[in-house]
Regions:
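Active-site-adjacent loop/helix surface patches within enzyme catalytic domains
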Residues: 2-153
């Protein structure tokens, strides 16, 4: 994988046109990482690239490490919303947005785990969190996904 003219190049990269983003991103100095909360990397990338959708991201990284680039790195993506961090507002103006394909919070029924959209997740892909005397269950990230993220960053 290489970087050429603000886009990633390589066999593992799929580019989707996201024509709604046109403002220049001058000097990004921050990376904002999100979970998609979707059913797949491709469906999340297509949703984010859709002209009618009010959000976008530079990249979506799938569970096998595949990459979807929606917005070049020299163009502002709309991934951080109305944000503030360390005294700065509107982080979209300073940051690259990367989405990791992940179902997010899961629901347990007996010994099974399900996404918000009804897909069953195997127990080996579930992280259990215990806070304030309450259990919650989350979809884990995959090793290929995290390796790709590290390589990109």
């Amino acid at each position: 994988m290489t970087l050429f003219e603000h886009t990633l190049q390589g066999n593992e990269i799929t580019r989707l046109a996201c024509s709604k983003n046109t403002q220049p991103l001058i000097h990004p100095d921050t990376i904002v990482i999100h979970a998609t909360g979707g059913s797949s990397a491709e469906s999340s990338a297509r949703y984010l690239a859709n002209k009618a959708t009010p959000v976008s991201a530079h990249l979506v990284i799938g569970r096998r490490g595949e990459i979807y680039q929606l917005v070049p790195f020299n163009v502002i993506a709309w991934h951080a919303g109305k944000s503030t961090h360390k005294g700065r507002t509107n982080l979209n103006r300073y940051s690259i947005g990367i989405e990791l394909d992940n179902a997010g919070k899961l629901h347990r029924r007996g010994f099974q785990f399900f996404t918000e959209f009804g897909k069953e997740i195997m127990p080996s892909e579930v992280y259990t969190d215990y806070r304030e005397s309450k259990l919650s269950f989350w979809h884990t990230y995959t090793e290929p996904q995290l390796n790709t993220l590290v390589k990109i960053c």
